């Protein structure tokens, strides 16, 4: 087990991904433990020590000899920026910590989608299970309390409600009925998941439909596909952009709809080039489609998985 000093903190292990949604993490006393989302259940985490005194539980995870060796080496003023210890991993403790990280990731990033067939998870069941797991490692995550988040569309808290799979067909049918097309120009866009509250907008690609309407007053109508019929999009900000220029902005109603005045005459609307217009929903966050695709692929794997993380 190799420890490396970086930015004043000792850390071990490697994380392949830099994008936050692709990392599962749990905060322990005096340390942060992180895994790539697609690593096996008992993979070794990257451990970053944030407080050496608080991290007095480390022996429970890597064994007492390795912990003693770490403390002696880390506190040695002549020690270089890296050293190795012989860890003897406690696999049950490792699995419990990974479960906590996995559960927090599920709460924050599970890609609920009626279109893609990814159902919502039971929030109450997840909270109950994660708090039971936390009790197994209470000396490591002292004071840890896994809780469901508030169901609000104007914060970045993550929420989840239990929903039968049969409801998704109804949701998808409703969305198709209210799909919008326009006489001048129409388009679609994909919001950044990191800029949205979880489980409000359907996690399929391009859930935002928009079209330009010229009469009686020029507007841009926006319909966002919500995660299910109980989701509430009210208050989510929408911006109509052409490059850095903001053409218009507004807010969704609870159905995920907004009609945004363009401030143009009918003639000006017809003369505009709409091909480079982007409709942004939520907070402006740089995020690639590849990140979302990786999460969708991981979710499909988890739906089929039969390991101890399930």
Positions of the model-derived regions?
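Long, hydrophobic alpha/beta structural blocks
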Residues: 37-205
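C-terminal, beta-strand-rich globular interaction domains
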Residues: 174-310
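Charged, amphipathic alpha-helical stretches
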Residues: 1-64
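A residue-identity detector for tryptophan
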Residues: 3, 10, 35, 57-59, ...
């Amino acid at each position: 087990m190799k420890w490396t000093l970086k930015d004043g903190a000792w850390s071990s292990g490697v994380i392949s991904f830099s994008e936050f949604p692709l990392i599962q993490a749990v905060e322990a006393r005096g340390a942060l433990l992180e895994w790539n989302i697609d690593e096996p259940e008992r993979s070794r985490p990257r451990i970053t020590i944030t407080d050496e005194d608080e991290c007095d539980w480390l022996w429970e995870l890597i064994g007492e000899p390795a912990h003693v060796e770490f403390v002696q080496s880390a506190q040695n003023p002549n020690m270089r920026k890296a050293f190795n210890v012989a860890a003897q991993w406690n696999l049950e403790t490792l699995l419990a910590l990974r479960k906590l990280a996995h559960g927090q990731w599920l709460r924050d990033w599970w890609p609920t989608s009626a279109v893609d067939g990814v159902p919502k998870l039971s929030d109450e069941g997840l909270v109950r299970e994660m708090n039971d797991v936390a009790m197994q490692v209470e000396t490591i995550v002292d004071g840890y309390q896994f809780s469901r988040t508030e169901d609000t569309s104007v914060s970045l808290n993550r929420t989840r409600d239990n929903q039968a799979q049969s409801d998704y067909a109804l949701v998808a049918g409703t969305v198709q009925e209210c799909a919008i097309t326009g006489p001048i120009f129409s388009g679609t866009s994909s919001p950044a998941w990191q800029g949205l509250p979880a489980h409000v907008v359907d996690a399929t690609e391009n859930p935002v439909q928009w079209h330009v309407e010229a009469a009686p007053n020029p507007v841009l109508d926006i319909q966002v596909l919500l995660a299910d019929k109980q989701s509430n999009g009210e208050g989510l900000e929408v911006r109509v952009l052409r490059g850095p220029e903001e053409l218009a902005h507004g807010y969704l109603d609870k159905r995920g709809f907004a009609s945004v005045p363009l401030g143009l005459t009918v003639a000006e609307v017809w003369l505009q080039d709409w091909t480079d217009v982007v409709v942004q929903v939520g907070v402006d966050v740089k995020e690639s489609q590849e990140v979302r695709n990786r999460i969708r692929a991981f979710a499909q794997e988890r739906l089929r998985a039969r390991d101890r993380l399930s």
